[in-house]
Amino acid sequence: MRRSTTISIASKANKFLNLCLLQKGNPVIVPFISRFWGRTFSTKRSSMNLEEEIDLFCKMIQSRPLPSIVDFSKVLSKIAKSKNYDLVISLFHHMEVCGIGHDLYSYNIVINCLCRCSRFVIALSVVGKMMKFGYEPDVVTVSSLINGFCQGNRVFDAIDLVSKMEEMGFRPDVVIYNTIIDGSCKIGLVNDAVELFDRMERDGVRADAVTYNSLVAGLCCSGRWSDAARLMRDMVMRDIVPNVITFTAVIDVFVKEGKFSEAMKLYEEMTRRCVDPDVFTYNSLINGLCMHGRVDEAKQMLDLMVTKGCLPDVVTYNTLINGFCKSKRVDEGTKLFREMAQRGLVGDTITYNTIIQGYFQAGRPDAAQEIFSRMDSRPNIRTYSILLYGLCMNWRVEKALVLFENMQKSEIELDITTYNIVIHGMCKIGNVEDAWDLFRSLSCKGLKPDVVSYTTMISGFCRKRQWDKSDLLYRKMQEDGLLPL
C-alpha cells in the first residue's frame, strides 16, 4: 500500500512538473528537479514496462531543466536489457538531436546495442565520436565490440581490434581473450584459438575455467581429444578445477569415438573430484553408447543417473528410444515411452516420429498408424514423410496415396523428399504413368527434381522396359548437372 501510494504521488508530481516546469534555466527548481528524478528512479522503475520507460524518456526530454545524463542512461540501460536494441539506438540519436550530451556510460550502452544488431561500422564511428569528445574507450567499450564481432563470426576483425587497442596502450583482460577464443572455437578456428591462448599466457593474462572450457570443447569438436585431455591435465596442474562443462565435453568426444573405458574413467574422476554429472553428461554417455549399438548399457546408464538423483529429460528418453528402435527392439522403446510419461515428461514430435518409424521398420504398419493416431504433439513434415515411406515399404501404397492427397489439400508445405517417396511408391506397384505425371508436375509446384527423383523414375521406366524414356530422362538428369547414385 505504501509503495503504491509513493508511485501514485510520483506520477502526479511528474504530471505537475511537465505542466509547470518547462521553462529553461530556473535556478530555484534545479535541485528540486534532480531530487524528483532521483526519487522517480528509486521508487518506480523496477515495475515499469517498456511503454512506461518510453513515456518516461519523452517526459525527461521535455523537462526543463533537463535531467542529468546519468538519469537518461538509466532509461537506455533498462530498455537495452529488454533487448530492444533498435529502440535504444533511436532514443540515443534523439538525445543528440535535442542537444543532450553523452557520457562514457551512455556511449557504451549504444555501442553494445549497435554491435548486437551487427551494425559494426556505425559502432566504430560512435567510438570515434566519443574519443573526439575526450572519452577514451574502456574495457566495456572494447568488450562490446569484441563480443559483437565474435557473435557475427568476424573473429579476425576482433583480433585486429585488440591489436589496434594494444597500440593505444589498452591491455586486454581474460574476458576479452575468452570471448575471442570461444568465438574462434565455435567457427572451427581451433588452431587460432590455441595460438591466442599461448599469446595470453605470454602477456601474463592468467587463463580461467571459462578459457579452458571453450578450448576443450573446441578441440573435442574438431576430433582432437588427446589435446583436449592434455589441456584438462594442464588445468589440474594450475589448480583450475575442471567443472561439469569441461568434463562433459571430453566425455562426449570419447564415447562418440567408441572410447568407453576412457569416458568412464573420466566420469569416475569427476565424481571423485565432487563434480556432479548433470543431465548433459549422462545424455552424452547414453548417446555415445546408443551410437555404437550398446543400448542395454545405455539403459543401465539411465538407471544410474536416476539413482544418483539426476532426472532424465526428453532428450534422454528420445536418445534411448531411438537406440532401441534402430536395434529392432521397438517394444522396449515403447516401454521407455510409457516410463517417460510416468515421470511427467511429455513426448515431443521427435519421440513420436522415432516410435512410428521403429514400428514401420519392424514390419508393423498397423501399430505405427495407431501411435500416429494417438499423437499428442503436432506432426511435422518429417512425421508425414515417415508415414508415407513406411506405408509404401509395407505395401500399403493405396493408403499412402490417400494420405498424400489429404496432405496436398492441407496447409502442409511438401518438400522434394515427400514427392520422391510417393513417386517411389507408385513405381513400386507398377503405376509408372501416374508417377511420371507427378514427376512432371514438380516444376509447377516450385520444386526441382533431385538425383533421387530422377533415379527413382528411371528405375520405374526400366522395370516397365520403357528404355527410350529412361534414356531420355538419364540425359536430362546429366543436363541438370546431377550425377547418378
From Swiss-Prot:
**Does the record bear Cytoplasm in its keywords?**
no
Pfam families attached here? PPR_1 (PF12854), PPR_2 (PF13041)
Task: Give UniProt keywords alphabetically.
Answer: Repeat
Q: Where are the PPR repeats?
A: 68-102, 103-137, 138-172, 173-207, 208-242, 243-277, 278-312, 313-347, 348-378, 380-414, 415-449, 450-484
The biological processes this protein is annotated with in GO are: seed germination
A cellular component annotation (GO) from this entry: mitochondrion
Instruction: Please give the InterPro entries that the UniProt record associates with this protein.
Output: Mito_RNA_Proc_CCM1, Pentatricopeptide_rpt, TPR-like_helical_dom_sf
NCBIfam families per record = PPR
What does the sequence similarity comment in the record state about its family?
Answer: Belongs to the PPR family. P subfamily.
Protein name as annotated: Pentatricopeptide repeat-containing protein At1g62720
| Species in which this protein is naturally found | Arabidopsis thaliana
In the record, what lineage is assigned to the organism producing the protein?
Eukaryota, Viridiplantae, Streptophyta, Embryophyta, Tracheophyta
